Amino acid sequence: PPKGKSKHVSPLGDDNSQMPAINISEGFNLGFCRCRPGKGPLMHNHDTNETFMPITGKWRCEWNEGDELEHVDLGPCDVISFPPGCSRRFMNVTEGEEDKDHLLLVVIAGNAPKAEFTDLAYERIKQFETTNN
């Protein structure tokens, strides 16, 4: 969030979702996440399903929070899909390559999907803002 602090955001970024290069209704959004080990988004959910497939590296996909938290680790070409409303996050957990980015393919259903961070994710954002201001 912070920009406007809206609880609902586009998974593709505010600017990208507002001005698409090709204005069509394809029914899905496809993108890549590139990051180093230990990095990934905070826990969130979407109003549509979301599918992940690692291209390189090892990625941990988590769902639910607290005592209900579960996860699975995926390697290249493994696939996992989360239903609408299920809290989820992913993180690069590749070992021995701390300075190397890895790639995760992300497919989000729908023409205008929305994302919502969980309450615990917002607590982490507030903690970060407090310690970095």
Mark where each language-model region is.
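Short acidic-glycine-tyrosine-enriched beta hairpin
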Residues: S25, N49, M53, E65-P84
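Histidine-centered metal-chelating micro-motifs
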Residues: K39-L42, R60, D78-I80, P84-F90
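Conserved hydrophobic/aromatic beta-strand scaffold that supports enzyme active sites
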Residues: L30-R34, T51, H71, V79-S81, ...
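Short beta-strand segments in beta-sandwich/barrel cores
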Residues: G31, G40-L42, E50, G57-W63
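Short histidine-centered beta-strand/loop micro-motifs
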Residues: M19-N23, P41-H46, W63, H71-D73, ...
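A short, N-terminal "cap"/entry segment at the start of jelly-roll beta-barrel domains
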Residues: P1-G27, N133
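Double-stranded beta-helix
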Residues: S87-N133
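Conserved short histidine dyad/triad with adjacent acidic residue
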Residues: S10-Q18, N29-H46, P84
